């Protein structure tokens, strides 16, 4: 077969993927979702079913008051259409601090309620306060989640090794945000890259910096070599890639998943692996 270095590519033979993740289901999501849609980007919005519709004002010394009221249950399905809804715990409790029965209740009731509102199974979760332990991960898996996001910035574009320790690249207020965006779009190398930004919609009001996310989305949107996907779509794609089955000499690859996959086997050779099909791989040079 010649020399090979099989490397994952994203749909359409793209080498880059961009996703975002925003928490708490605050009313600022209405403006944020519109910005996402206007720029053709996608993300995951992590909601607390138990507080949807709750009215609240955040007050902190030396800071302006910020409306942190939550969106209404009735608008969830239409507001987040085209994006992804994820779980964030029923009441945004520190799940790792709770007894296991109550932690499971928070996870299950949140997921069940949000699934009724969206009409589809939830795949993604964001840890409240970024806090988790082995018990929380085990309960999330039992509830049917496929992955969960932390709040630990990596400043890198590496693909996740553990879907339940999904570390983002950075928060939108990170001083290196636009530098990272530039590195992501224009950096050299052939390995797949994931740029993953997170935050809370209310922070744009509190910091009076909506121009920050507008600048990022204007810069990131509209690139043909970038796959714009939700958190769940990316993890599902990576999971399907892990399921590939090789013949012993590498001349055939079977894709048992329901997802078309894309692969680079050398600098000159790329393959599309159709869902549920076995593909004969083209020869590569020695």
Regions found by a protein language model. Give the residues of each.
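Boundary/entry segment of secreted carbohydrate-active catalytic domains
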Residues: 1-28
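C-terminal domain-boundary segment and adjacent tail
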Residues: 2-10, 38-40, 115, 147-156, ...
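Hydrophobic "anchor" residues on beta-strands that sit immediately upstream
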Residues: 19-20, 84, 226
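A Trp-anchored, charged/polar loop motif used as the substrate-binding/catalytic surface
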Residues: 26, 171-186
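Short, well-ordered alpha-helical microsegments
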Residues: 27-31, 133-136, 262
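Metal-dependent polysaccharide deacetylase catalytic core of the NodB/CE4 family, i.e.
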Residues: 37-146, 153-166, 170, 193-201
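Well-ordered, non-membrane alpha-helical segments in soluble/globular domains
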Residues: 66-72, 107, 177-182, 210-216
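Non-membrane alpha-helical structural segments and their capping/turn regions in soluble enzymes
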Residues: 100-105, 175, 207-210
């Amino acid at each position: 077969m010649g020399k090979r270095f099989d490397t994952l590519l994203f749909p359409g033979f793209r080498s880059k993927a961009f996703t975002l993740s925003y928490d708490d289901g605050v009313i600022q999501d209405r403006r944020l979702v519109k910005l996402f849609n206007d720029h053709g980007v996608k993300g995951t919005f992590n909601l607390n079913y138990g507080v949807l519709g709750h009215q609240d004002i955040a007050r902190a010394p030396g800071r302006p008051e910020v409306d942190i009221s939550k969106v209404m249950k009735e608008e969830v399905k239409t507001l987040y259409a085209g994006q992804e809804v994820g779980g964030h715990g029923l009441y945004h409790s520190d799940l790792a601090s709770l007894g296991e029965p109550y932690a499971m209740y928070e996870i299950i009731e949140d997921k069940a309620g949000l699934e009724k509102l969206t009409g589809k199974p939830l795949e993604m979760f964001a840890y409240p306060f970024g806090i988790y332990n082995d018990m929380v991960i085990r309960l999330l898996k039992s509830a049917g989640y496929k992955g969960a996001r932390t709040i630990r910035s990596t400043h890198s574009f590496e693909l996740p090794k553990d879907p339940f320790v999904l570390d983002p690249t950075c928060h939108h207020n990170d001083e290196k945000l636009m530098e990272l965006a530039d590195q992501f779009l224009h950096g050299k190398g052939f390995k797949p890259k994931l740029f993953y930004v997170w935050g809370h919609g209310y922070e744009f009001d509190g910091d009076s910096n909506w121009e920050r996310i507008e600048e990022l989305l204007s810069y990131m949107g509209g690139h043909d070599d970038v796959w714009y996907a939700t958190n769940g779509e990316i993890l599902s794609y990576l999971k399907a890639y892990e399921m590939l089955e090789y013949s012993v000499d590498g001349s055939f690859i079977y894709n048992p998943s329901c997802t078309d996959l894309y692969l680079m086997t050398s600098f000159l050779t790329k393959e599309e692996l159709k869902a549920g099909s076995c593909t004969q791989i083209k020869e590569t040079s020695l």
